[in-house]
Amino acid sequence: MTLSEDTLRAVEATAGLIAAQGIEFTRAFYERMLTKNEELKNIFNLAHQRTLRQPKALLDSLVAYALNIRRINELYELKGKGLPVPPEHWAELQGFFSAAERVANKHTSFGIQPAQYQIVGAHLLATIEDRITKDKDILAEWAKAYQFLADLFIKREEEIYAATEGCKGGWRQTRTFRVEEKTRVNEIICKFRLVPAEEGAGVVEHRPGQYLAIFVRSPEHFQHQQIRQYSIISAPNSAYYEIAVHRDEKGTVSRYLHDYVSTGDLLEVAPPYGDFFLRYLEADEQAPADTQASQEFQMLQSGAINFAAEKTMPIVLISGGIGQTPLLSMLRFLAQKEGKETARPIFWIHAAHNSRVRAFKEEVDAIRETALPSLRVVTFLSEVRATDREGEDYDFAGRINLDRISELTKLEADNANPHYFFVGPTGFMTAVEEQLKTKSVPNSRIHFEMFGPFKASH
């Protein structure tokens, strides 16, 4: 299915009006939908509604779709005719499809189903009618444009569902897990080891950097089901997952997991998902989700670096606060996969508020000493305490500044082409990205994920 010129013009003509209303438009949409379809409160993070993070994410997505709709339509017209899509056309749409891939992974972790797209579409059109235009012809064209986008997501999400379910140890929707271990890492972080409730059952191996969605149902604590994603910190294996949960005093689920969930308790868990991961495929091995992907999403991986084939390419892991969790899975994986024999320079650069809340220091130091001698660990502390020792508890005082790490500067000067993976709070992420851009690091070597509703991963 492709779109007519009438549809393209209608969307392009009204997209600016939606953008001009800003989050007031998407906030009105969510208020309408969650009032009339209360069951969706079991899916949406209501805290993100209050902070307007979700309305802002939807606004960005709608505007991005409207701005790209003509080029997207041209792509599908070429595909429908069996004609090749020029490389420059793919390049122009890489940002859109990268964002779509991240959203599709989020949706599958929530267990989104095709019927729910019809609910969203009905309320989106009603909001356009209430706030943008009552022109029936324009509304009819927007309905076609929305269905076009919905079909794209429904198809991709089914590909992801099927690929994950088809893996050894895989499943669809949720599965019951038991908390095998709960460990307090420090005053604000707890670690949970999760195993299938069925004795002896295995799990699908995640890709280092992916996350689990935890479905929390506790009527005495929450009026509605709560769903949260937590990065997996364990290396890929077929027996268990480990997650680390940062206690947010303003949060609901993190406090619940810290205070009320204990060893032996049961949790409902979706399979591992996420498009932010370390791509490491041995010869003749293909990632499950890639085998199922349609052409436009396979193109996202066509130029991706396979670190199994690039044994000396440097990897730089940069984290702020709890952002270290997906990177810890990557580091553990590299320690297992490459170990002492690796010729690859690896950096672990971490920024923490102070040494008291810095997590996993002992483990990272142990990995460096026993498994990855090529690992260079660098710590920035915003707040240095009187008992902290430079060179042991931290390397640099203050906010993260990559220019202070001479080895990184040398790698860039020597054209070693290091790849940077970074995760953390919004301000931290912005600072790191700006510093890398200042060093003229191309997007192809920048990989990031922001915790929250939406920001495209590179």
From Swiss-Prot:
Per the record, which residues fall in region Reductase?
169-457
| InterPro entries the UniProt entry points to | Cbr1-like_FAD-bd_dom (IPR008333), FAD-bd_FR_type (IPR017927), FNR_nucleotide-bd (IPR039261), Globin (IPR000971), Globin-like_sf (IPR009050), Globin/Proto (IPR012292), OxRdtase_FAD/NAD-bd (IPR001433), Riboflavin_synthase-like_b-brl (IPR017938)
Q: Which residues bind NADP(+)?
A: 321-326
As given in the record, the signal peptide range reads none
Q: What is known of its domains?
A: Consists of two distinct domains; an N-terminal heme-containing oxygen-binding domain and a C-terminal reductase domain with binding sites for FAD and NAD(P)H.
- Family from the record: Belongs to the globin family. Two-domain flavohemoproteins subfamily. In the C-terminal section; belongs to the flavoprotein pyridine nucleotide cytochrome reductase family.
Q: What's the protein here called?
A: Flavohemoprotein
Its gene name is hmpA
